[in-house]
Amino acid sequence: MAQDDNRSKALNAALSQIERQFGKGAVMRLGDTPRVATPAISTGSLGLDIALGVGGLPMGRVVEIFGPESSGKTTMTLSVIAQGQKQGKTCAFIDAEHALDPTYAEKLGVNLDDLLVSQPDTGEQALEICDMLVRSGGVDVIVVDSVAALTPRAEIEGEMGDSHVGLQARLMSQALRKVTGNIKNANCMVMFVNQIRMKIGVMFGNPETTTGGNALKFYSSVRLDIRRTGSVKQGDEAIGNETRVKVVKNKVAPPFRQAEFQILYGKGIYHAGEVVDIGVQQGLVDKAGAWYSYQGNKIGQGKANAAQFLEDNPAIMEEIENEIRARLLSTPKPEAESQEKAAAAQDDDSLV
């Protein structure tokens, strides 16, 4: 017992010295902080929010979205920005590809007047702007589109055909080392859009890899693999893409879940269609033949008409969506838990 007391005193002395040297809160017991559910921003896709396990993409983390060309990567990031702006959050878009279409962004629900946009000349400039925005503490969501377009200054100033081996990977590695701590402190989500490249000479396994080295894979809390699986057709005309998103890495919930949804051209993620599909799966929306009904009332013949009814009646759609989220998102109630523990501790004290 005496030895335990000495160890405890030594630990307390060390903690006091650390707090004096580095400030209060430099070291603390994990149980001292209140447990809160991970704050998240919806992706705009109900199925993907459920697959992510926390109702969306987590705040204060790095997120990577990658996939082939025209798979919906930028559409996904603009959808997240639109959802964030609805919650009153400040969003920024670092357009390294110089390909942002304001008209399309507006159609997806983005408020252009409030969106901060930067079109940097070099990769260093883009990441420096990102770091300064994070450190300001006034930005909630930052999108970098894309990692492949973050061209190092040496490459831009050099001759065409010059070899710059590993330059972009070193740039990303250094930037992420610098910015990660600030991202957590500012509770800001930074989303990196990435492209796919092929590894040469791979005989077995997946030859696909993402650009910018391995650092982003390690620092990301969530990695989403987005793919186009087919076309949505109205008669002979293609009006959208069938899209599948796989959560290949998730530090805030179980990974490897999948979500499938439609992205309609000029409209974005087909949210009402997802609510109908998942509502049928959960037994909230009844389907008899081609007719869909909710609480005994017919809402439309065919999925398109049922979805249109929900779009015209947002209160009913919100009611169905809230019920789906309550059933499928097993979010703990940390406040209730902490209150129960406090009450139990008081009971124990009174018994003593």
Swiss-Prot record:
InterPro entries linked: AAA+_ATPase (IPR003593), DNA_recomb/repair_RecA (IPR013765), DNA_recomb/repair_RecA_CS (IPR020584), P-loop_NTPase (IPR027417), RecA-like_C (IPR049261), RecA-like_N (IPR049428), RecA_ATP-bd (IPR020588), RecA_C_sf (IPR023400)
Origin: domain of life: Bacteria
A single cellular component GO annotation: cytosol
GO biological process: DNA recombination; DNA repair; SOS response
Main subcellular localisation: cytoplasm
Annotated compartments: Cytoplasm
Ligand binding (ATP): 67-74
Gene3D superfamilies membership: P-loop containing nucleotide triphosphate hydrolases (3.40.50.300)
Keywords assigned: ATP-binding, Cytoplasm, DNA damage, DNA recombination, DNA repair, DNA-binding, Nucleotide-binding, SOS response
Coiled coil location: none
Chain's role: Can catalyze the hydrolysis of ATP in the presence of single-stranded DNA, the ATP-dependent uptake of single-stranded DNA by duplex DNA, and the ATP-dependent hybridization of homologous single-stranded DNAs. It interacts with LexA causing its activation and leading to its autocatalytic cleavage.
Entry's family note: Belongs to the RecA family.
Protein name per its UniProtKB record: Protein RecA
Species whose genome carries this gene: Chromohalobacter salexigens (strain ATCC BAA-138 / DSM 3043 / CIP 106854 / NCIMB 13768 / 1H11)
